[in-house]
């Protein structure tokens, strides 16, 4: 009996100990995030309020301004917004057709041994950090763009679009290819039985049936193109 009571006390103690430990860990995480948010908002909102080192600043000028020189009190992010939109649109216009055709090739056209090699390679590319894509763009793409660009450094929107296109391709391909493979086999068999060719079946039956997955892949690609700042900074 005494031994059982001792074991029960140990269990209760350990349970309370870990409960308190996990609670402290959760509180630490919440407080850390809250402090980060307060710091970011404090620094970000400082120019819009009087009696600070930056002085007052108009929110409309902040959104529409085309000049970013904090040293002189100019905080316009309009050109950043425009550049982000143009770079994302360019990457989507170039990347989506390539990703769509690549997904069709992996899911429907390529022999199974080849598809089993290409599919993991695409998934591996999707896991590469953005900083590595940025280094690749800086070392490879920027010098290539430099040869056709009027800017001596090679820094241009074209280089950014090229890097973002390469970045979003694996993400879109992985999602779209999975959606294509999820289309029921009966759809394909029915189309072929009606006399359609394989390509007609793919583009008129399979792709429309997988349109929700295709849209999801495009949205994820857009999200990554907009959110990946490190690669753009390096390029």
Predicted regions and their residues:
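Transmembrane alpha-helices
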Residues: 175-176, 198-234
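Hydrophobic positions within alpha-helical transmembrane segments of bacterial inner-membrane proteins
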Residues: 31, 84, 88, 92-100, ...
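Transmembrane-helix boundary motif in ABC transporter permease subunits
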Residues: 10, 91-122, 143
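Periplasmic/extracellular loop-to-transmembrane helix junction in inner-membrane transport proteins
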Residues: 5-16, 42-91, 111-112
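N-terminal signal-anchor/first transmembrane alpha helix
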Residues: 12-39
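Generic hydrophobic transmembrane alpha-helix motif, especially the helices
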Residues: 123-168
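Residue-level signal for discrete positions within transmembrane alpha-helices
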Residues: 80, 84, 120-123, 127, ...
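Glycine/proline-centered hinge or cleavage motifs at structural transition points of membrane proteins
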Residues: 129, 194-195, 208
